[in-house]
């Protein structure tokens, strides 16, 4: 990391590692895992998550390196993903630009490549969008890519739902984004999308993320930075 974490950020990072290890121990297809990571605005959530990604991929005091791990960062606006991507690139001294990918409408792969961070936004995931439809030019939908990767490596595939930097949108647009985000938490039979094995929700207000995970069958663990 190019940035030095404050003590409260280090404490949150250690807690995230502990909860992830616990989630991996508890995980089964019938018991998917969710971690709710809450921190107030300005607490450096993206910096903490960048340190977490580095630790998992490159090794850390809490465990050995897992270089095949994959992270998918989901938000509701492409501009927010771009801001987060730039922050990760500026704060990390280990990830290179080639390791960080913005998923566009042309993306088509059976699996996500190991060792990468992938940014995805809900605006590209509607039923009428190219990423979600098969065609003569597309072999795999994004739902199939997610499902295949989760099945192949359930304990090294991380979905990060960015609730902390939600864009300003109409109620209708916000409801659509929430419905799409819930597919990662609850699965979607019509899309062939299973429940993702481990979802980390990054939020400034726990109530907002709680609405996303309401009625889920997942085990929910909590990490919180005090205000």
Where in the sequence are the language-model features?
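Walker A/P-loop
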Residues: 27-52
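Conserved H-loop
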Residues: 42, 76, 204-205
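Flexible phosphate/Mg2+-sensing switch loops adjacent to catalytic phosphate-binding sites
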Residues: 22-32, 58-71, 92-105, 175-176, ...
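N-terminal pre-P-loop "Q-motif" helix
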Residues: 3-31, 121
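Conserved Walker A/P-loop ATP-binding site and its immediately adjacent core
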Residues: 46-51, 62-96, 121-127
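Short loop/turn elements that form and flank the Walker-type P-loop nucleotide-binding site
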Residues: 31, 67-68, 112-113, 152-155, ...
